[in-house]
Amino acid sequence: LSPALHHGGFVTCEPCDVPVSKRHLDMLLTHMTLSDKPHLGAITEMSRAQDSVDMAEIIFGQDAMENNCVIMGNVNTNSPLLVDKVVTQAVRVYCGRGQGIVVVPFILSGAMGPVSTAASVAQAVAEAMMVCAYSQLGRNGAPFVLGNFLSSMSLKSGAPTFGMPEPVISNYAIGQLARRLGLPLRCAG
């Protein structure tokens, strides 16, 4: 309800007193009834992704869902260069119904990706484009958002080093590549 916030995300608060098998339903219902902001749906299991899309159809109707993106899923690749069953199933559910998917390669340079900024950016774009191509097999023209979470790590301690200049440079580079590819961009950090 704040004018400064444009999106509700998905897990605003994890209701740990609700069984895991039903938790996503309560979180979705809360977003749908207590907020006027767009939000993400569940992606952790195919059935939860399906529940998210089905609940969105109850709210918006089948015709609106056929012609509009009313809910999106946010998935991560398993760097380096791996897309697991959970991600592929979520992509099939959302994109198969014409709904959007945000793909965010999560890469800590030096751990799950190359040390250099340019090589990490190349890996992130390759992983995201792999999922983009797969999403279009589910439904040609399905909405796709290029995501990015590139950070660095201390090669001395192995600890993530948030706030370093390399991730900012990566965001700029991926932003330019997203613009060239004609894709909307979501960056973390």
Each predicted region: which residue ranges?
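Helix-rich catalytic cores of soluble enzyme domains
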Residues: 2-189
